[in-house]
Every structure is written in structure tokens, then in C-alpha cells.
Design a protein with these regions (language model features):
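Solvent-exposed loop/turn and edge beta-strand elements of beta-rich ligand-binding domains
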Residues: 1-228
């Protein structure tokens, strides 16, 4: 299995049960054909008659057999044994399958609010960035959290919109989180301290977003239920 955004090398996943020594395959060519779920040929491994090893040929030569599926994918490997002398025996083929399971990462954002007079119903806005790309915008009330799922591996930055929450001082308005196969579930914790005089309008009246302690599925962009 791999994580979304990572890759796998098909050459390392296709294994032959037979051992060829050049004698036991002196009169047959053996070919392993790898196809994707749509039936398209991804690559072939051919052991010529009389040889103890073969060579790979990939449909995308530059890939070298490396694939990065965005969802769980099953591949079919067809082993075909073809006699080099015609009219003696017919070719024989047998199929086998293997699956590359694609897992996804998650990112939990939590907001804590401190200070005298802090209003737990105030809302705070966070932009989740991957490089220069906006992944999603999250709205949280104080002392709440939300989890974004369906994320690929990579470096993310959670940035608070301090122009919106101008009456609160964040400990750090930006948190960097690296998601990987080793660390697939990241977390960004941001604490805000209420200033002496604070005022904050509900962002729900301005943009059609959500406030919830809920899961947000990045793959579907479905807002939370709005329940705590």
C-alpha cells in the first residue's frame, strides 16, 4: 500500500514463480504483461528462449514502471508461454492480480482561546495551504477542532486570517505540518488570547462556510454538520 501522492514501482511488485536457467526454457519465450483496471498495457517483462533473465518494456518509457495511482487500483499480470517452434504446442496464458491500496492523510486543526472576556462563540478563519495552492478554508469557534481527511502527502501550512480575528492575538498565526507515510495524521494547534476590547462578527454571515467539531472530507469538500 502507498499514501496518496506517493508512488510505487511495478517492477518490484511483479514476481515470477518459475526460475529460468536457459535450459528449462530453451524452446519457449515467456512474457509477463501488466495491465491496469481499464485493460491498458502498462508494461511487459520478456524472457527470451534460452535466457535466464529478461527485460522490462514500459508503455511510458520515462516512468520506468513507476505509478502513482490516486485511488486503490488492481493490476492484472498475464504470464504467456509461447513455443518458439510453430505447430508443436500452443501458447499457454495464466492471469494473476495484485492491488495497490491508496491510503490518505488527515490534518486536525484545533483552536484554543484564552484571556479575560474571551467569547467561546467567536469564530476564527484558517486557510489550509499546500505550497501556493489553497486546499480548503476552515472556520472554528474557540476551543474546538476539526479534521480534514482525504489529503495527499506533502507540506501543508495552516494560516489564520488575523485580519478577521483582529481583536485576538494568536501565539503563532501560521503552523507548518508535514504529512507523509510515516506521519499521515498531522495536527496544528493555535491559541489566541483575547485583547482588552474585542469584537468579532460571525463569519457565517459573510461566507457560506461551517463551524463544527466534525470531519471534513477533502475529497468531497462536504461541510461539517454544524454540531459540536
Amino acid at each position: 500500500s502507498i499514501y496518496l501522492g506517493d508512488s510505487a514501482n511495478l517492477q518490484e511488485l511483479v514476481h515470477q514463480n518459475a526460475t529460468f536457467d536457459g535450459t528449462n526454457n530453451a524452446f519457449v519465450d515467456v512474457t509477463y504483461t501488466v495491465k491496469d483496471e481499464n485493460g491498458g498495457t502498462v508494461g511487459t517483462y520478456t524472457v527470451p528462449a534460452g535466457s535466464s533473465s529478461g527485460t522490462w518494456a514500459w508503455s511510458d518509457a520515462a516512468s520506468g514502471g513507476t505509478v502513482a495511482p490516486e485511488q486503490t487500483t488492481t493490476y492484472t499480470v498475464t504470464c504467456t508461454v509461447s513455443p518458439t517452434q510453430s505447430g508443436t504446442y500452443e501458447s499457454v496464458s495464466k492471469d494473476a492480480t495484485f492491488t495497490i491500496t491508496v491510503n490518505t492523510c488527515s490534518l486536525t486543526i484545533s483552536k484554543a482561546v484564552t484571556g479575560d472576556g474571551a467569547n467561546p462563540n467567536q469564530t476564527f478563519v484558517f486557510n489550509v495551504m499546500k505550497g501556493d495552492d489553497l486546499v480548503t478554508t476552515v472556520v472554528l469557534k474557540g476551543n474546538m477542532s476539526t479534521t480534514i481527511t482525504g489529503l495527499a502527502v506533502g507540506d501543508y501550512t495552516v494560516v489564520e486570517d488575523t485580519n478577521w480575528s483582529w481583536s485576538y492575538t494568536p501565539d503563532n498565526g501560521s503552523k507548518a505540518v508535514m504529512l507523509s507515510s510515516i506521519n499521515p495524521n498531522g495536527e496544528a494547534k493555535i491559541t489566541n488570547t483575547a485583547k482588552e476590547n474585542h469584537w468579532l462578527t460571525s463569519i457565517v454571515d459573510v461566507i457560506n462556510k461551517w463551524t463544527a467539531k466534525d470531519n471534513i472530507d477533502k475529497t468531497g469538500h462536504v461541510p461539517g454538520s454544524g454540531t459540536n
